[in-house]
Amino acid sequence: FLQGCPWACPYCHNSAIIDPRIPGVVAWSALEDLLARRRGLLDGVVFSGGEATRQIALGAAMARVRELGFGVGLHTAGPYPRRLADLLGAGLVDWVGIDVKATLGNYEAVAGRSGAGERAWESLGIVLAHPEVDHEVRLTVYPDGPGDGFEVAARAREMGARIFALQQARDLGTPDGFAATRPGWDDQVRSLARDIETLDFDRFIFRGDS
């Protein structure tokens, strides 16, 4: 889990590491020691966050992990499209889980930053332009969200996404005041899941509240 993120999503479950200045950094040498002990037991390393692509040294870290014989995965929300393109173009990533949070017009309300939507959707296009890299496109929904989940999924499918996951937000680790549910919310999310299932993804994953 890499510290820091430029966005401020209300349902973020890793809000404790959004500030890159917090203590608790693990030395890279300690991570290499751990991987050396786990060789043959682990298939790969997933770089997550926060926002992993915020870290300038991410490419070098991925290259080192590959040298050690592990596969490389990446969780990203896509705020840095050019960095993402460089990582994929260099062949450093085997799998990407990319979060797409809303349609373009609703993005700022979710991510809390202007221009976030343009960057995220550009990043999705970059991921889908690399068919050699496995992907999972993810949408997290919550009661006070924009309610555009089907439109998000349909647009991702039009762009060529093969695997799509609908995730129901939980309140574990989220900022104070976040509400993960309301009366009838579970039924609404299940209905949305059924609608998205009609879009004919190669694989559709529903991560509900249980």
Regions from the language model: what does each represent?
Residues 1-26:
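Canonical Radical SAM [4Fe-4S] cluster-binding loop centered on the CxxxCxxC motif
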Residues 2, 168, 208:
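Pocket-edge structural micro-motifs
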Residues 32-44, 53-180, 184:
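Conserved AdoMet/S-adenosylmethionine-binding subsite of the radical SAM
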Residues 189-210:
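A C-terminal junction/extension of Radical SAM enzymes
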Residues 20-24, 50-51, 73-74:
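Short, flexible loop segments at the rims of nucleotide/cofactor-binding pockets, characterized by
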